[in-house]
């Protein structure tokens, strides 16, 4: 098994605490609402949202994947940090055992935030992880972030 790391940062005009609440803590209900073309639904299969929780994310018809299962590894409210692992379905296919993800939202002096994202791709056997595949996953995540950000800008009273 190989492990391939991919790290990225993206900025947002939304304050860190509000973005953490909307994108991470309430994302299971907000993201299907603001980006139904990307995610149809999110349901907890096991657990209450904390570490160990298993979630099933269902994608809309016409998507390349039907669903993905994720396990919550850490929810750190004080430091706006969230870690989870994709453990079944989706982009894992025949080459990946799991993908471990960490999102840390850091406040910026101008009142916005920086999302620091770390992805660890655990491949099966001696499979290689292609850079364009990692980049495509990052772009999909960024599109979800922008959908949430647009919603929050249009609804200044939401998720405060």
Swiss-Prot record:
One of its GO terms (cellular component) is cytoplasm. InterPro entries: Bet_v_I/MLP (IPR000916), Bet_v_I_allergen (IPR024949), Plant_def-hormone_signal (IPR050279), START-like_dom_sf (IPR023393). It comes from the Eukaryota. Brassinolide binds at residues 55, 82, 84, 101. CDD domains: Bet_v1-like. It is found in: Cytoplasm. Disulfide bonds: none annotated. Signal peptide: none annotated. GO terms for molecular function: abscisic acid binding; protein phosphatase inhibitor activity; signaling receptor activity. Coiled coil: none annotated. Keywords: Allergen, Cytoplasm, Pathogenesis-related protein, Plant defense. Pfam families: Bet_v_1. SUPFAM superfamilies: Bet v1-like. Belongs to the BetVI family. May be a general steroid carrier protein. PANTHER family: OS08G0374000 PROTEIN-RELATED, STRESS-INDUCED PROTEIN SAM22. This is Major pollen allergen Bet v 1-C. It comes from Betula pendula (European white birch).
